[in-house]
């Protein structure tokens, strides 16, 4: 089962304040532990919402609306994420609890969410087969 550890933004991360070298070192050590355990799939930090773009669909069937950042409510923003694959929900919680304070200022907040697997969403064998083809193509593109 896959889980995403969503690192919530703070006013500092939204202002573009970069983490200290001490925090970078702590996060690198943590990521090394995830790699050694064979559970890390991806981990990235995100730029502030001021460089972001939001696409909204104000009404069903209407044209999409493009909105440039910055966006309000830093607590609702995401500053980064770590994607892991583990055997149990409890293991995901254990890894999330081991993550250093993601901002280093005592403001860190991590939201842990389980990722839907393709099988959870697509019960139709034809849809599953099409999805498998797409995933193989993505893997082949990564190798090229």
Descriptions of predicted regions:
Residues 1-144:
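Conserved, structured core segments of small domains
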């Amino acid at each position: 089962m896959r889980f995403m550890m969503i690192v919530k933004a703070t006013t500092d991360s939204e202002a573009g304040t970069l983490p200290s070298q001490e925090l970078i070192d702590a996060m690198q050590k943590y990521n090394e532990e995830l790699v050694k355990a064979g559970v890390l799939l991806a981990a990235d930090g995100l730029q502030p919402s001021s460089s972001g773009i939001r696409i909204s669909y104000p009404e069903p069937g209407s044209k999409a609306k493009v909105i440039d950042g910055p966006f309000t409510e830093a607590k609702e923003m995401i500053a980064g994420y770590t994607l892991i694959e583990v055997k149990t929900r409890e293991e995901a919680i254990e890894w999330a609890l081991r993550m250093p304070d993601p901002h280093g200022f005592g403001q860190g907040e991590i939201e842990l969410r389980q990722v839907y697997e393709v099988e959870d969403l697509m019960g139709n064998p034809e849809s599953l087969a099409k999805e498998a083809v797409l995933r193989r193509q993505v893997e082949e593109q990564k190798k090229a």
